[in-house]
Amino acid sequence: MGLNLKAPPGAASTAKAGGEAAASLLGTASGNEEPRLGAAMRELTRPSSNAGRMLMCAPAHYCVDYTINPWMENQIGKADNALAIRQWTNLARLLAREAELAFVAPAPGLPDMVFAANAGLAIGGTAVVSRFATKERQPEESLFHAWFEREGFKIAPWPRDMAFEGAGDALLDSSGSLIWCGHGWRSNPGAARLLETIFARRAVSLRLVDPRFYHLDTCFCPLADGWLLYYPPAFDAASRQAIAELVPAEKRIEVGEDDARLFACNAVEVNGRVFMNDASENLRRRLRAAGFEPILTDLSEFIKAGGAAKCLTLKLSET
């Protein structure tokens, strides 16, 4: 299948058809990667008629030059930007077969902006823009706010002093009636109650206890038809109990340490296909038995900064 990427109309910082807009989207990549990335993005601006929409941010400025999670330790200066661009483009091409992709322009000096899941949480035309816990990512907030505003989202007010890192720590279940909310490392535990009020649906707060899994989406992935892919040791006992009470045992796909470290739970599910960095054959077999098709795509350069497929995307059409 050919590429099916469409830029949303009316957004100055999103891709439009043609090379000029692609160059604007990408900003300035380093060295010889600028023409290569620009060419890829021109290809990724072809129209799509598929339902569903996701936000991504090109890795033109991606690197690891600070440490804000355990995955970044000893990785400063070691990320290969050229390889990251190829990996990100491969993911975008795969997703473009299933959904319409929108883009926010990357900004120099903000290497983690590529992790678009942390732009905010968007449900039914309303967006909550993230309030980052770490000073390194706080300059991203105004850029994401401007993007949501240009796209016509209603921006819900959010307290300046309440950390909330978007769809990294807030995930909608497949029924749309429940928001799973993570806290413990980045987002404030009070975020769940505010999200309940803003989006008029139940929010369940889950406490994360393993610093390697600092966002909910690194260890917890709601799938279609009420299925759940998750790593239980990332949660405290009360949170594991809450999950058990809300998700039937036969629909819980538990992953082990090895798969968790591969960021298997940091996956994106679209139309029954689960896009992920990697997974053991055992986990792939269990996903297939549940009716899902695992699609593996190497995202190892982004794991150096603590993210994979889910971190690189934000669903915009959830209701």
Regions found by a protein language model. Name each.
Residues 2-10, 18-19, 23-319:
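The feature marks the mature, well-folded catalytic cores of soluble enzymes
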